[in-house]
Amino acid sequence: MAVGKEIRNQIGSIKSTQKITSAMEMVAASKMRKAQERMQATRPYAEKMRQVIGHIAKSNKDYRHPFMQEREVKRVGYIVVSSDRGLCGGLNTNAFKLLVREMREWKQQGIETDICAIGQKGASFFRNYGGNVVAAVTHLGDSPSADQLIGSVKVMLDSFVEGKIDRLFLISNEFVNTMTQSPKALQLLPLPEGDDEEIGHQWDYIYEPDSRPILDGLMPRYIESQVYQGVVENLACEQAARMIAMKSATDNAGSIIDELQLAYNKARQAAITQEISEIVSGAASVG
């Protein structure tokens, strides 16, 4: 019964793979919870930082920090956040599609794009795609720190100050819930105008000697905090997407095993029926 043996081998192989995907699902679920906690802890800081920057900027209207200066767009920069590893569904692909679409739109206007890639998948994809990757940082691990991002982010900030790029955007995945992660594009530079009502009625600070040195010191930290928030949120998205992908793979493996088991039972039944028929035929011929 060669066919039956082959099916048994297939079932054994798929069961082994199913154990691996099931284990990966549980690991991803555990990492996702930790990543969610980190994401929720950093969100208030990033939001408060945005409000503080907006308030300080409005308190000194005579001074325009370089990060707030609008100019004609001739070249743009993107910081794109991706994962270092795969097996996380379409998470990276969706973010890459968003950036590629925006790159094409800029290209139609005669505007080129510089890319800072955070994550191995993004760096590899855009280098192969032909994008101008001017900075990259990979292998951040499951607990990334802001210090790991400073070097690559500074490359883009310096490019903006020096006039090499005229706008800077961040592309990352937003954690909606465990089942849904959505890619988004956020303008970092020049700093978008804040909501007057949101900013104007919360504080009444006195700055001594003035707000300019405070703004100069906080601006780079603000951009770094926004990028770090994007990285932390993308990590939570990655683990959620991986958990869902591995659960789907485990469930699919179970369905395939059931189908193969049915095929094996049919093959075994056919073999037994054939043996009985041969025995009956042999007995009849002897009789």
UniProtKB/Swiss-Prot annotation:
It is found in: Cell inner membrane. It is a peripheral membrane protein. SUPFAM superfamilies: ATP synthase (F1-ATPase), gamma subunit. GO terms for biological process: proton motive force-driven plasma membrane ATP synthesis. GO terms for cellular component: plasma membrane; proton-transporting ATP synthase complex. The keyword Zinc does not apply. Keywords: ATP synthesis, Cell inner membrane, Cell membrane, CF(1), Hydrogen ion transport, Ion transport, Membrane, Transport. InterPro entries: ATP_synth_F1_ATPase_gsu (IPR035968), ATP_synth_F1_gsu (IPR000131), ATP_synth_F1_gsu_CS (IPR023632). Pfam families: ATP-synt. GO terms for molecular function: ATP binding; proton-transporting ATP synthase activity, rotational mechanism. HAMAP family: ATP_synth_gamma_bact (MF_00815). F-type ATPases have 2 components, CF(1) - the catalytic core - and CF(0) - the membrane proton channel. CF(1) has five subunits: alpha(3), beta(3), gamma(1), delta(1), epsilon(1). CF(0) has three main subunits: a, b and c. Produces ATP from ADP in the presence of a proton gradient across the membrane. The gamma chain is believed to be important in regulating ATPase activity and the flow of protons through the CF(0) complex. Belongs to the ATPase gamma chain family. This is ATP synthase gamma chain.
